[in-house]
């Protein structure tokens, strides 16, 4: 039987601060509590932790609903056009289209800022044409964007 503790700080393997978790007694007694990462759960702390978790779930549900609305908006706008310099043949790009380029195009067309690190380009975009990229908006909410790469000029 484990020991119930309330985390005082975020612990990668257990959860976020304020979370009620059950761990092995030795782990709690010898590591988590002495390091100041957790405290032994008392009835008052358990009640407070449950209240915080309910609040966190409520806030997360609101963020998820907002993210789903944003996804719908982004996907409804159709193609996002990117203009890039091309070589002699008219198809081969100088360089590639990057996550930053996609983020800037989305911001200018949709007015929605997406962190470039949340944009996934499956294969390097080195030619003009139509491509699909994914933008992670919130945890597991991912928008699929269609990108039209055209020659600049």
Swiss-Prot record:
GO terms for molecular function: rRNA binding; structural constituent of ribosome. It comes from the Bacteria. The keyword Zinc does not apply. Gene3D superfamilies: Ribosomal protein L9, C-terminal domain, Ribosomal protein L9, N-terminal domain. GO terms for cellular component: cytosolic large ribosomal subunit. NCBIfam families: L9. Keywords: Ribonucleoprotein, Ribosomal protein, RNA-binding, rRNA-binding. Belongs to the bacterial ribosomal protein bL9 family. Binds to the 23S rRNA. One of its GO terms (biological process) is translation. This is Large ribosomal subunit protein bL9.
């Amino acid at each position: 039987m484990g020991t119930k503790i309330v985390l005082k700080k975020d612990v990668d393997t257990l959860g976020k601060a304020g979370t009620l978790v059950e761990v092995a007694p030795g782990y709690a007694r010898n590591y988590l509590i002495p390091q100041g990462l957790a405290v032994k759960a008392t009835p008052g702390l358990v009640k407070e932790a449950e209240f915080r978790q309910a609040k966190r779930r409520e806030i997360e549900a609101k963020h998820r609903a907002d993210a789903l609305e944003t996804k719908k908006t982004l996907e409804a706008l159709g193609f996002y056009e990117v203009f890039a310099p091309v070589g002699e043949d008219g198809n081969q790009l100088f360089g590639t289209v990057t996550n930053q380029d996609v983020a800037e195009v989305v911001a200018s067309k949709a007015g929605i800022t997406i962190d470039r690190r949340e944009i996934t380009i499956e294969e390097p975009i080195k030619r003009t044409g139509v491509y699909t990229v994914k933008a992670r908006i919130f945890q597991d909410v991912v928008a699929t964007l269609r990108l039209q790469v055209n020659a600049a000029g």
